[in-house]
């Protein structure tokens, strides 16, 4: 199987069950601190929302589709492989044939199916904002806050917005679909 060198691909990573969120957070921190943003792009925990009715009240629950697994979008290099494998809570890559062998990426159709199930797409969001423009955050913990775009990370579909909190400008990282231009 010929594989494009330097291509961004999705890989499944095995974690301790129940540690998926911690692994995602740890890996995202390591990517930033080890300056791997050009090689490791997104970390996704496959989840789906379920509505459960209890005592006559509907309650939305988020359920892990594949407990014990996290998807990582990366360019497979020795460095990116090392960073992911040595993240606390990661037990290994799925599709790795043993010690020292690199794993096989997930098939594009598999990734599209999983992301579609989660209500996500292989992101192709076109954001019409530029650094310095004012935006309103539509969702998340900073919903309805207005701030100035400080940085745009198109490859990660994220941007940094400066919002006023307690009289200070604070940088907040949000995804493209969480903002609207003013």
From Swiss-Prot:
Highest taxon, organism lineage: Bacteria
Database matches in Gene3D superfamilies: 2.30.30.30, NusG, N-terminal domain
Gene (UniProt): nusG
UniProt xrefs under Pfam families: KOW, NusG
Intrachain disulfide bonds: none
Organism: Staphylococcus carnosus (strain TM300)
Family: Belongs to the NusG family.
GO BP: any one term: DNA-templated transcription termination
One Gene Ontology term, aspect cellular component: cytosol
Sorted UniProt keywords: Transcription, Transcription antitermination, Transcription regulation, Transcription termination
Record function comment: Participates in transcription elongation, termination and antitermination.
Keyword Signal: no
UniProt name for this protein: Transcription termination/antitermination protein NusG
Domain KOW: 131-163
């Amino acid at each position: 199987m010929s594989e494009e060198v330097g291509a961004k691909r999705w890989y499944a990573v095995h974690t301790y069950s129940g540690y998926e969120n911690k692994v995602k957070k740890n890996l995202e921190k390591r990517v930033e601190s080890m300056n791997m943003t050009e090689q490791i792009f997104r970390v996704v925990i496959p989840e789906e929302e379920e509505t459960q009715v209890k005592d006559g009240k509907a309650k939305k629950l988020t359920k892990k589709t594949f407990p014990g697994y996290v998807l990582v979008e990366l360019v497979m290099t020795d460095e990116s492989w090392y960073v992911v494998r040595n993240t606390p809570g990661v037990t290994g890559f799925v599709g790795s044939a043993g010690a020292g062998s690199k794993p096989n990426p997930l098939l594009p159709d598999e990734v599209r199916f999983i992301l579609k199930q989660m209500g996500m797409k292989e992101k192709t969001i076109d954001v019409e904002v530029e650094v310095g423009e004012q935006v309103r955050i539509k969702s998340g913990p900073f919903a309805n806050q207005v701030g100035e775009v400080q940085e745009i990370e198109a490859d990660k579909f994220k941007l940094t917005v400066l919002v006023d909190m307690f009289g200070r400008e604070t940088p907040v990282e949000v995804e493209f679909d969480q903002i609207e231009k003013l």
